[in-house]
From Swiss-Prot:
Keywords: Activator, Nucleus, Transcription, Transcription regulation
Name of the protein in its database record: Cell division cycle protein 73
GO terms for MF: RNA polymerase II complex binding
Gene3D superfamilies: RNA polymerase II accessory factor, Cdc73 C-terminal domain (3.40.50.11990)
Phenotype of null mutants: RNAi mediated knock-down is embryonic lethal. Embryogenesis proceeds more slowly, with embryos displaying defects in the positioning and shape of epidermal cells. 60% of embryos arrest at the bean stage of embryogenesis without any significant change in body shape. Nuclear localization of rtf-1 is unaffected.
Composition-biased stretches (Basic and acidic residues): 124-135
Amino acid sequence: MDPLEALQKHVQRPEEFPLREVTVSGISYVAFGDYAYKKDTETSLQIYGKSDEFYSLESLVVFLKYSHENHGVYVKEAAAAGVRAVTRIDRKNVTEYLQGDRTDFPALMNQVNPLSLRQLLHSSEPEAKKPRLDGEAAGEPMDTSTSDEPQESAVSAAKKEVEIRALNDNLTKDRIAEMRRKRQSHREKGIVTIDESLSTLTSASLPKTRIHKTRENVMLGARDLSNVLDIITSAQRQWDLNEKKEKVAAVHATNLSKDQSGAAGGQQQRSGYSRYAQEAFAHEKTKEIQTEGSFIGSNFSSIKQGHHAVQKAPDAPPGRPPLAKPIQLLTSSTATSSGSSAAQNGSKRTSRSPIIIVPSAMNTMINLYNVRDILQNFSYVPVDQRRKETNKKPVDLAIQRQKNGVTYNIRVIDNAEKLANDDWDRVIAVFVMGVAWQFKGWKWNGNPTDIFTHIPAFHFHVDQDKPVAQVMQWNVHKIPVSATKRHMDKARFSQVWETIENFVRKNKPHLTARLGL
């Protein structure tokens, strides 16, 4: 069998012809099953452009080992092994021949007869391990006569027992012979047939194996409890905030009681310095400048005493209108009283922040979990990933938009039913998921066509898939999002803000200041 043919059979049937490299008497051999060849044996594959040079068996074995790598890596490995590398031109032809796709290579080399691997390994054993079965070693003369049955004479000569001599009185020749026969019978009964290809198969598959359990991951649990640390951190932050509020409330209560006691007794005792009660002494630093007052009709003493000793201005002459009454500057104490009175009257501050509505479902590409990553950080993060990292779903979210070095807040909600009629005037964008029930309870009777006429709408979809069929019928901006190319997110999401800003300039100019336009 030609070495190239043996290598081809190994590629096609590796279990029947396993590859094995052995060294016998300092000579390296490549064995395919029981067929062994020297490593430097030349094959019938001719090198391209050189009619008198052929690839050696070792070169093809190295090529077969690194055939899955690119050509540059293979050339480095071949140079490290000290063999000739298969050229890039011959690479495809050699691969097709080894896989059996081509058989048209000319047989230019003489066929090399293989050696038996078992005989090579047997010949390499030391003399002490070889069984002495020949008659000459046993001291018996060899029969040199010719016979018609040489096979029977060889078998009979192999079956002759080795000369046995007694060692002592207890271990006689008969005793030693009996022990040898008993040992031989035990060996024959205990023989287990072992496939010689198992060792080669194990060595070939060892680089591809992966350790499933190690001493570290075997102690890991099946549940992911990493979010427990986030829960503890948020709870600790809330505890610190509550403790700080309690301290501030205690200081204010102490100062208030001291002020009341001082006013009742005609004396006011000033409390010690506290960093939590800075507002209690703010009225001492406030300058009561009466910008709309007048000094006409006042004397120097009244001016020096301030508004506590303001005297009644003299009556104006009949031909002159009365002077305007000086207005006191609003101090911290008056501001506090006015704020408390406003709170008692039930007045509520009206929000002026723009509003963006996102879907509330979990099977969408955008909702309250990842809207900050998309519209503020310009990076797409899947909803499931952000959901695992977040303790609970945010109810009302505020994202920040940087414009000309100024930060603007935009409110994001997923429940449009709680919006009043005035709030709908501040809605600047809607993100749709492709179903009509999303707009149930919305303004304009929940009609998607009317909603998209008054508010710009956007729909995110994977760039490899088409948008939902229902979305294709709506006036919606389709934004494709790549599943792997995160560097394209900023350009895609910037288009969303550009569309929103153009809409606000044209249709809602009262919100331009809220977006820095």
